Amino acid sequence: TSLPIIIIPAIISFLFDIYKYKLNIMKFTNTLIKGKLIKRYKRFFTDIKVNNSIVTAHCPNTGSMKGLLDKDNTVFLSKNDDPKRKLKFTLEIIEANKKLVGVNTHRANKIVADGLNKGLIKEFKSIKNIKPEFKFSSDTRFDFLCDKNIIEVKNVTLLRDQKVAEFPDAVTERGTKHLKKLIEALKQGYKPFVLFLTQIQGINNFKIAKDIDLNYYKNYLIAKK
């Protein structure tokens, strides 16, 4: 029995400042703020030019963000005025190569959860119980347990040829570990899935970037057998 691989495009539309997954609309709380990227540094920080000011925004993506970080790329920020927050702005989307790319990895699970709850993902239309952050073992958590289905979500932001999204954008030991653990779960009677959420505007094709992480690619092939 092979490990099912699911690829879901999350279409980003700025006509309404929303995330859109098929018929499902997931609105941002507030209108996004447009700016220009100056730089990203220390993984979690980005300097953004908004009008005539420079603001520091939280970068909620710890990956390499390969191909997205060119200076002066258009970006979209969300704003939170909670006084407890050190940074009021969060980097949500970057426009690169004329494509809008959702870079907030925290939103990936929210998009999938919304799709699960509303029955928009055909593989899981009949599920009854959705449990986020499923603890599979002492050192491994998966994103969702839906009845006996384990779902691990991977956020996809890499686009190198304008037609095909790719994962990963850097070597991912954690991703490889997840594949191996999902194979273990299969042997234990679970039905595990890898769900690649492609947050790139207008892209429906996907492949593994084997030139970036050959080990992940090899384990991906093992999982598919």
What is each residue range found by the language model?
Residues 120-137:
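A short acidic/basic microdomain associated with nuclease active sites
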Residues 39, 79-84:
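Short, charged beta-turn/beta-strand-edge "cap" motif at the junction between a beta-strand
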Residues 1-2, 13:
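Low-acidity, Ser/Thr- and Arg-rich intrinsically disordered low-complexity segments
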Residues 200-225:
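Domain-level recognition of nuclease-like catalytic cores that cleave nucleotide substrates
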Residues 35, 142-169, 182:
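Conserved catalytic cores of phosphodiester-cleaving nucleases, focusing on short active-site segments
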Residues 85-97:
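OB-fold/S1-family single-stranded nucleic acid-binding modules
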